[in-house]
Regions:
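Glycine-rich anion/phosphate-binding loops
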Residues: 54-62, 104-121, 153-161, 204-209
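Second-shell residues forming the walls of enzyme active-site clefts
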Residues: 24, 51-72, 76, 86-88, ...
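Preference for extracellular/luminal or secreted protein segments
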Residues: 1-41, 255, 273-369
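Second-shell loop/turn segments in exported
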Residues: 28, 49-52, 102-110, 148-155, ...
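N-terminal hydrophobic targeting/anchoring segments and the immediately downstream early-domain regions
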Residues: 1-94, 369
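Acidic-leg catalytic submotif of subtilisin-like serine proteases
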Residues: 81, 119-129
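Divalent metal-dependent hydrolysis catalytic cores, especially in the metallo-beta-lactamase
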Residues: 45-51, 129-137, 289-293
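Surface-exposed, active-site-proximal loop segments in enzymatic domains
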Residues: 91-105, 141-152, 193-194
Length: 369
């Protein structure tokens, strides 16, 4: 397996640092500054949002262009948030899915697998490799402003069963899944896009409610796990989960046995931005075994993150070793999912009769449950 950055030259450190970034774009096509950054930093992936989407053919061509700019053994992993409900970046003529709560309410795991397969086929049809789905949070707080019906259920048992089934369906179709937001964003009363949520629970309650869906995701072979910018004082009173070695390395990796890729939530979110210096965020998150960092919109912040990761590796041998380990995991994900990938589904998959029938059934049966 060819893995970037196994020597200690400055060039390799720069390449490793770029590999650890998944960056967003400003619009529906690349501008000159974005092209220059891609040429210099060679990021490990990209994430597209509604602002980048005009229609399916345009998204497919943009994703193809992004891949063509970084040829060779390290193709970028092209990502999207396509959950269903309010979080759908590619809309009609793609299937418009109800919230995953409706899918969970249907109560049949084979149905959930079928939805995962259908979503995977549609995002792959427009050129994506990874869907930041499913939400593995338990909707346990009625005052939660950001999770709600994005979660499959209000119980850890229900979320666990449907998260595992969805991941199996999605990854069976060759699309990398992501369980988010570890160790849980379901019992917050604030939105981490706006401020740092704090979950005041004892360890036993966290063990019983928040963690089981993520354990189920790990058992199902999930390709990636996304962190939560949430503070759990009972687990770590000093740092939010994204920056907590006790939570990520101690619980997710060591206790749950997860050896895959850990992705940070967006570094632009106000839960962390402005509260912690960027280089401190990067250092603590990397120490906690975060592999890849999301910078979803601001190119200047992506550039600062790239330079920050380079500086950390140049001044700290342990950080240099962590960067190598992160790149190994990121590239192992490519090897697992992209090397022997089935042919890309055609654009006629979007909104096809089979998928429309699934969405209609979820909307009808799930709303009544």
């Amino acid at each position: 397996m060819n893995v970037v950055g196994l020597t200690t030259t400055t060039a390799d450190r720069k390449r490793r640092a770029g590999q650890r970034l998944v960056v967003g774009l400003a619009g529906a096509s690349l501008d000159a500054d974005e092209r220059a950054f891609i040429r210099d930093a060679r990021p490990g992936g990209f994430i597209l949002f509604a602002r980048n989407v005009e229609e399916p053919r345009q998204v497919l061509e943009l994703n193809r262009e992004l891949k063509s700019l970084l040829p060779g053994e390290l193709p970028p992993i092209r990502c999207v948030d396509q959950e269903g409900g309010l979080v759908q970046r590619v809309k009609a003529p793609a299937t418009v899915w109800p919230p995953m709560r409706f899918v969970g309410n249907v109560g049949k795991l084979e149905f959930t697998r079928a939805v995962g397969r259908a979503l995977a086929r549609e995002v792959r049809a427009v050129g994506f490799d990874l869907d930041f789905a499913p939400v593995a949070d338990v909707d346990s707080n009625p005052k939660n402003p950001i999770i709600g019906r994005r979660a499959f259920a209000t119980s850890p048992e229900g979320v666990s069963r449907h998260v595992a089934a969805f991941i199996e369906g999605m990854q069976d179709e060759g699309c990398i899944a992501c369980a988010k937001h570890f160790p849980g964003h379901g019992d917050t009363a604030t939105d981490s896009h706006l401020e740092l949520p704090v979950v005041e629970k004892d360890p036993g309650e966290i063990e019983h409610v928040e963690l089981p869906p993520f354990a189920a995701a790990v058992a199902a072979g999930v390709g990636t796990v996304m962190t939560a910018h949430v503070l759990y004082p009972a687990l770590d009173e000093d740092a939010p989960a994204t920056m907590s070695r006790r939570i990520l390395d101690g619980i997710l990796r060591r206790r749950m046995g997860y050896g895959g890729v850990i992705v940070s939530d967006d570094l632009e979110m106000k839960a962390v931005r402005g509260r912690y210096p960027l280089e401190h965020q990067l250092a603590k998150a990397s120490e906690a075994t975060v592999d890849v960092f999301l910078v979803c919109k601001e190119l200047h912040l992506a550039h600062e993150a790239w330079e920050g990761l380079i500086r950390l590796a140049e001044t700290d041998k342990l950080e240099d070793d962590r960067a190598v380990a992160a790149c190994r995991r990121w590239h192992a994900l490519r090897e697992r999912f992209l090397r022997h990938l089935a042919p890309t589904p055609g654009l006629d998959e979007l909104g096809c009769a089979r998928h429309a029938e699934l969405a209609l059934r979820a909307a009808a049966e799930g709303a009544q449950s």
